[in-house]
A protein has these predicted regions:
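Nucleotide-sugar donor phosphate/pyrophosphate-binding loop at the beta->alpha transition
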Residues: 1, 11-38, 54
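Conserved acidic donor-binding segment of nucleotide-sugar-dependent glycosyltransferases
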Residues: 207-209, 213-220, 229-235
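Aromatic "clamp/platform" in nucleotide-sugar-dependent glycosyltransferases that forms part
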Residues: 157, 176
């Protein structure tokens, strides 16, 4: 059996603020043709979210009977044990990911500026590396300036992401598109509320108003409003974090997900 699994559709399906619509449209058709050929002999084509399946189907000839949405691949939850939030001042928000426009780094920074006008002691942590070869990336000079003005606490690439999640109050991922973000799953497993965007892959992780907030794409003002809500209502950091933990236990346990994948691989439906 041949199984294809797409963990996301990548750059050409990701919205952007520049005028790249025509270019991406052409690339979508080219990608769809290649996908039609490449997956023609696959018994199953697996997707992590429904939008990816629908969007690729619009631009390809993949047999719909082969396509299936499986949701998150999941985590070894014991590696991300629940740790109750300790509500201390200042409130600390955390971004984990490459510092690219498509990951929402610029919206995160813009929201931080808005929040700090009202609550200047609020902390904004960034985990992740610079991407010097990507034109949409935050530059080293920009980062140096942000650090010097005290806007962010830049940690860089680390091997102990979970420890930083534990030390933070709210996880923020303003991404433009995802498959099913592992970083959000990790934060939820530990018991952290989430602020994310209303885009494929991200909106599947949050029940708006229950374990966090879903904000419009590109809208740093609404994002800042939600951050301020947590600052002014710290009890919601705990209750929404607990809801995240509950969702993670139900939906992100690799020990429950792996047998389902195994059945698909060996011939089940």
């Amino acid at each position: 059996r041949r199984i294809a699994m797409l963990e996301g559709l990548g750059y050409i399906y990701t919205p952007s603020k520049n005028n790249s619509f025509l270019k991406k449209n052409i690339l979508k058709h080219a990608h769809g043709l290649l996908a039609s050929i490449g997956y023609a002999f696959a018994n199953k084509v697996l997707f992590l979210n429904q939008d990816d399946l629908v969007d690729l189907a619009k631009n390809s000839f993949i047999n719909s009977k082969k396509s299936k949405v499986i949701g998150p691949i999941g985590l070894e939850l014991s590696s991300y044990p629940y740790t109750e939030v300790v509500i201390t001042k200042p409130v600390r928000f955390i971004f984990v990911g490459r510092m690219l426009a498509e990951k929402g780094i610029f919206e995160y920074l813009a929201a931080a500026r808005i929040v700090k006008l009202k609550y200047p002691n609020t902390e904004f942590v960034i985990l992740g590396g610079l991407d010097h070869d990507n034109p949409s990336a935050l530059s080293k000079d920009q980062l140096t300036h942000l650090i010097s003005e005290g806007l962010v606490n830049y940690v860089g690439n680390v091997s102990n992401v979970s420890e930083w999640l534990v030390k933070s109050h709210v996880f923020v991922l303003p991404s433009y598109r995802e498959g099913f973000p592992r970083s959000t799953q990790e934060a939820m497993a530990i018991g952290r509320a989430v602020i994310t965007t209303n885009v494929p892959g991200c909106r599947e992780t949050v029940q708006d108003g229950k374990n966090g907030f879903i904000t419009p794409l590109f809208d740093e003002e609404i994002m800042a409003e939600k951050m301020i809500y947590f600052i002014e209502n710290p009890e919601q950091i705990i209750s929404m974090g607990n809801e995240s933990y509950s969702n993670a236990q139900k939906n992100f346990d690799a020990n429950k997900i792996n047998p389902i994948l195994e059945r698909l691989i060996v011939g089940g439906s």
